[in-house]
Structure formats: C-alpha cells, structure tokens
Curated annotation (Swiss-Prot):
Residue spans crossing the bilayer: none
Gene name tied to this protein: engB
Pfam family, one: MMR_HSR1
Name of the protein described by the UniProt record: Probable GTP-binding protein EngB
UniProt organism field: Shewanella frigidimarina (strain NCIMB 400)
CDD domains in the cross-refs: YihA_EngB (cd01876)
Length: 224
C-alpha cells in the first residue's frame, strides 16, 4: 500500500465519448492510469461515483436506467482518470445494441494498457448476474484487478448484508486475490474508506513510475 494519497474530491469532468465502439477516438492517449467503473444500469454507479468524490453531480444520475450511454471520463490529476462506462443489461435496450456494447467493453478491457483496475458495481440485493460475471472474467483474463462492489448496502440488515458478502466472496473464490469484494452505501457513506483505499492503490501501479521515467528521458534526449 502506498502512502501517497489521491484526493478523489478533485475529480473533474474531462470528456464524453458518444459511442463505445469507437472509444479510442475520444479517450486520452493510452498512458497514465485509468480506473473503470462498470455495472448494470440499475447498480447505482453514478451515485457511487458522486459519493466517492463527494460531488453531488459529477456523474449524472438518471431516473430511467439505461438511458444514458455516454462514456464519461473524469480527471483526477495529470496522470490519473476515472472512466464511467455505460450501464449494461437494461431490458429495454435493443439486443443488437447490447451486443455491440458488450463487444466494445470486452475490447476496452483487453486492449487498454493504462487500465489499472475495474470496479464492477452490483446492487447488493441482486449480485453476480450473468453480465457481471462476464465483466469480472474479462478483467481477470486481462490481468486487471477487480473490485466487486456491492452497492445500496443500506437496503439490507447487517446480518443479511454480511451473509451476502460471504456468499459473493465464496462465488468468486476461484479468482483468488485478483478480485476483492466490498460494500458501499452511497446514501450513508459506509464502506467508503475501504473503497477509496483500494482505488488509491490502483492509482499507483509500478509501471506508472517507469512510464514517467521513460517520458522524462525522452524529453531530455529530444533536440531543442
């Protein structure tokens, strides 16, 4: 664990990409660090992002799940970004469009070199649906750490919450330490310190220091 803390409250909107199938055209260069947030359309992803950054409207919430399919990128500092991926699995979205999103999401996970971690958000009352498992498996196969984040934890009693957490951890045991399971209540803030600690560690991968050293060396060698 690193002692260098990232202030997630400093997150600010950077750019939106209208089509996930052409994500590379809109995202910044494949350098630095990105942490992706993915989840079903009713998983409370926007509320979680707002709670973690202590900003009420950083990520726009919608009363109609699946309505907004923009990819929103938020900048933490010059080297680090949060990527809010479109919600998946909403019933009213045409099947062909669902398939396109899933294909593009899989490609993003497999090819984005600066991706340091993926947060897969799930309503704690309905965890580990098929698409959730697919996202987790894609990330693990791409050697990307995963945080399986059970949202809306205030909806359950403490005993039921802990049983659900234990059940989910048991179901994901095959992935070993590549997948962590935690809970979050965006409403009450419970679970937030642990989640931020994990995200902070992801913001400091070993390859970031190597990348910055290479950039500095190239800059020194460049003709004036």
């Amino acid at each position: 664990m690193t002692d260098s803390r990232i202030d997630f409250r400093r997150a600010k909107f950077l750019i939106s990409a209208p089509d996930i199938a052409h994500l590379d055209q809109y995202l910044p260069g494949d350098i630095g660090v990105e942490i992706a947030f993915a989840g079903r359309s009713n998983a409370g992803k926007s509320s979680a992002l707002n709670a973690l950054t202590e900003q009420k409207s950083l990520a726009r919430t919608s009363k109609t799940p699946g309505r907004t399919q923009l990819i929103n990128v938020f900048q933490l500092d010059d080297d680090r970004r949060l990527v809010d991926l479109p919600g998946y699995g909403f019933a009213q979205v045409p099947l062909a469009l669902k398939h396109k999103w899933q294909e593009a999401l899989g490609e993003y996970l497999q090819k984005r070199a600066c991706l340091s971690g993926v947060v897969v958000l799930m309503d704690i009352r309905h965890p580990l649906k098929d698409l959730d498992m697919q996202m987790i498996e894609w990330a693990v196969l791409s050697n990307i750490p995963v945080l399986a984040l059970l949202t809306k934890s205030d909806k359950l009693t403490q005993s039921v919450k802990m049983k659900t957490v234990n059940d989910v951890r048991a179901a994901l045991k095959e992935f070993g330490d590549k997948v962590q399971v935690e809970t979050l209540s965006s409403l009450k803030g419970t679970g937030k310190p642990k989640v931020l600690s994990i995200l902070n560690d992801w913001c400091h991968p070993e390859w970031l220091a190597e990348q910055k050293a290479e950039q500095a060396s190239a800059s020194e060698l460049a003709p004036e």
